[in-house]
């Protein structure tokens, strides 16, 4: 359960439009420091992320594109009106680029996508001062509980040791490793979580 002063809510794409600036600001704060500084998000629904230009590295435009995709969902944690954490994701489409640029190939039966197979947890971020209070786990559970997909996937920087540990405790397993965008900047572990088993 979240701390009493934290309000959690789940938003669809249209509702998430009003949270774009808050999400961009929090992401810039958290991702401006290692191990996140040199890795950009790939558009989990099929297109590679834009180049890192502008104050937010193009994130605002990517977030705007992603929130318009079918099935997009944003989970927020707020203290009063102040955003302290968020998670968002979309279902993968058959033409996704999610499984490209792996450091080693995977079997096609693992990487082939069809509607309803995989939900991509594109980002989960908690403001530094609010960590270790269970907010990350609450956001994780809020966005994934009740999903219709068979599994979820996430890509976590190899150097993000605390995040790696959290995902492992939450039942995720490593499936592959891939390069972040732009190429040569960082390595990401591609993780999977079986949703059909209720874990």
Which residues are covered by each model-predicted region?
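Conserved active-site alpha-helix within GNAT-family acetyltransferase domains
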Residues: 137-138, 151, 158-185
């Amino acid at each position: 359960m979240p701390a009493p002063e934290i309000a959690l809510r789940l938003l669809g794409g249209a509702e998430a439009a009003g949270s774009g600036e808050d999400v961009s600001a929090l992401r810039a704060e958290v991702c401006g420091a290692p191990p996140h500084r040199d890795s950009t998000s790939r558009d989990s629904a099929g297109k590679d992320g834009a180049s890192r230009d502008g104050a937010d590295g193009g994130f605002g435009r990517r977030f705007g594109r992603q929130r318009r995709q079918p099935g997009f969902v944003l989970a927020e944690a707020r203290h009063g009106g102040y955003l302290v954490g968020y998670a968002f994701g979309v279902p993968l489409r058959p033409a996704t680029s999610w499984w490209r640029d792996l450091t080693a190939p995977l079997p096609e039966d693992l990487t082939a996508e069809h509607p309803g197979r995989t939900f991509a947890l594109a980002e989960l971020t908690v403001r530094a001062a609010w960590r270790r209070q269970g907010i990350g786990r609450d956001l994780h559970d809020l966005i994934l509980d009740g999903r219709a997909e068979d599994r979820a996937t996430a890509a976590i920087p190899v150097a993000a040791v605390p995040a790696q540990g959290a995902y492992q405790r939450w039942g995720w397993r490593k499936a592959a490793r891939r390069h972040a965008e732009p190429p040569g900047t960082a390595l990401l572990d591609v993780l999977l979580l079986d949703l059909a088993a209720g874990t």
